[in-house]
Amino acid sequence: MAHKKGVGSSKNGRESHSKRLGVKVFGGEICKAGDILVRQRGTKHHPGNNVGIGKDHTLYSLIEGRVIFRKKQENRSYVSVEIIA
């Protein structure tokens, strides 16, 4: 019989915090210039008219207007902002 207590290292504590990715302003909604539209890893959604892209592939609005999601090519989504008349 062992007389020493078995000491094991913890196997928990490796979970990373969620990165809060995804669409922040949906199609048909109104946005202001500079609003973040989509946070993503890679270009799941591509920038369309009046939309800029950050170094971490975040899409943001360049003007105030209405957000539009379109699929121009096979499996390629574009996010645009249209001026409200």
Swiss-Prot record:
| Gene3D superfamilies recorded | 2.40.50.100
GO MF annotation, one: structural constituent of ribosome
Family as reported in the entry's similarity comment: Belongs to the bacterial ribosomal protein bL27 family.
Give a GO cellular-component term. cytosolic large ribosomal subunit
Record carries keyword Amino-acid biosynthesis: no
Among NCBIfam families, the record links this protein to: L27
Q: Output the PROSITE patterns linked to this UniProt entry.
A: RIBOSOMAL_L27 (PS00831)
Superkingdom of origin organism: Bacteria
Q: What is this protein called?
A: Large ribosomal subunit protein bL27
Q: Does the keyword Ribonucleoprotein apply?
A: yes
Q: Which is one Pfam family of this protein?
A: Ribosomal_L27
Which species does the entry assign this protein to?
Answer: Azobacteroides pseudotrichonymphae genomovar. CFP2
Q: Name one GO biological process term.
A: translation
Tell me the keywords, alphabetical order.
Ribonucleoprotein, Ribosomal protein
